C-alpha cells in the first residue's frame, strides 16, 4: 500500500515575509553551544504577538540547560532512561526565567510512559535533537497509562523544537490490532505525544513516527501553533491518526507533513477560534496529498 502524505500550510493575509534569526544559548549543567537557532518569519512573529505567545529570545538572556545525560540517561536504546528524563524535567520545570530540557542528538533514549506535568516556574524550551523511543512490547506496557506514552499537562509558555524524533515503536501494537486481524480483541493503544490542558505552546520541526495508535493529540488546550512537524507511519499501520485536535481553541497547524497509515491524517473536534479586540483570526489551510 502506498504511503499517503498530507502537506498542510496556513496562509496568513497581508503580513510581510522576512527571515530573521533567533539564537538560544545554554548555561545549566554545561556550557551548551547547541542548535537553539530558529528561523522565523515576521509573519510568525506577528502571529505569535497576536496570540500572545512568548518572546523566546527576549533580551538575549542565557538559558539554563537540563541535559538528560547529566541526570543519568544512557541513550543506547536499551537501558531505561525514564528516571533521567523525570529528573531533568523536574529541574528544568522548576527554574525561573528561561530554561531548556535537552535531549542530545545522535542517541536513542528508551523512555516508558510518563506524564510531564506543570505548571513550570518560567518559560521552557523542550529541545529534542536525539530520538526518544517507546518500549516495543505491549505486554510490558505500564497499566497505569494504557492510552498515553509521552504526556505533557498543565503547561504554559512552552516551546517544543528540534531535529530529533519521537518513535512510538508501534509495530507489535499494530500486529495485535483488531483492525489488522479481526480475531484479535479490540483494545485501545497509547498516543505517542499528548499536549493536554496547556496554553501558549509552540511545536516546531519535530518528527513523530510509528505511533502505537494516534501520533499527536492536542486536547483541552488554548493558543497552540504547530509548524514544520512530520508524522510518519507505514501505509498498513492501523488507526494511526496523524494529528488529533479536540476541545481546544486557537490552534494553528502550519507546514506539516503527515503520512499516518491507513486512518485519518487530521481530525478536529470542538475547535474554537476567538475574536481578539476588533481582529478576527483568519487563515486558509491548504492541503496537498502526496503518494510515494
Tell me what each language-model feature is.
Residues 2-292:
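Extracellular/periplasmic carbohydrate-active domains that bind, remodel
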Amino acid at each position: 500500500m502506498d504511503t499517503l502524505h498530507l502537506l498542510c500550510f496556513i496562509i496568513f493575509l497581508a503580513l510581510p515575509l522576512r527571515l530573521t534569526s533567533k539564537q538560544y544559548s545554554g548555561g545549566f549543567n554545561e556550557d551548551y553551544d547547541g542548535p537553539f537557532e530558529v528561523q522565523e518569519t515576521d509573519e510568525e512573529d506577528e502571529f505569535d504577538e497576536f496570540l500572545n505567545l512568548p518572546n523566546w529570545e527576549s533580551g538575549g538572556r542565557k538559558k539554563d540547560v537540563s541535559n538528560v545525560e547529566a541526570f543519568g540517561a544512557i541513550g543506547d536504546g536499551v537501558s531505561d532512561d525514564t528516571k533521567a528524563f523525570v529528573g531533568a524535567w523536574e529541574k528544568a520545570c522548576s527554574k525561573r526565567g528561561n530554561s531548556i530540557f535537552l535531549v542530545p542528538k545522535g542517541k536513542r533514549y528508551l523512555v516508558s510512559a510518563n506524564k510531564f506535568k506543570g505548571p513550570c516556574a518560567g518559560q521552557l524550551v523542550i529541545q529534542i535533537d536525539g530520538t526518544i523511543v517507546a518500549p516495543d512490547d505491549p505486554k510490558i506496557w505500564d497499566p497505569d497509562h494504557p492510552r498515553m506514552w509521552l504526556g505533557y499537562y498543565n503547561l504554559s509558555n512552552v516551546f517544543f523544537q528540534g531535529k530529533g524524533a519521537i518513535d512510538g515503536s508501534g509495530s507489535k501494537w499494530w500486529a495485535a490490532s483488531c483492525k489488522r486481524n479481526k480475531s484479535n480483541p479490540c483494545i485501545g493503544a497509547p498516543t505517542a505525544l499528548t499536549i493536554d490542558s496547556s496554553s501558549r505552546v509552540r511545536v516546531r520541526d519535530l518528527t513523530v513516527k510509528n505511533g502505537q495508535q494516534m501520533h499527536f493529540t492536542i486536547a483541552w488546550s488554548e493558543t497552540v501553533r504547530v509548524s514544520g512537524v512530520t508524522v510518519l507511519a507505514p501505509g498498513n499501520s492501523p488507526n494511526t491518526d496523524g494529528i488529533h485536535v479536540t476541545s481546544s481553541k486557537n490552534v494553528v497547524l502550519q507546514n506539516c507533513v503527515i503520512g499516518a497509515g491507513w486512518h485519518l491524517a487530521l481530525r478536529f473536534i470542538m475547535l474554537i477560534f476567538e475574536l481578539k479586540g476588533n481582529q478576527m483570526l483568519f487563515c486558509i489551510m491548504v492541503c496537498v496529498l502526496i503518494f510515494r
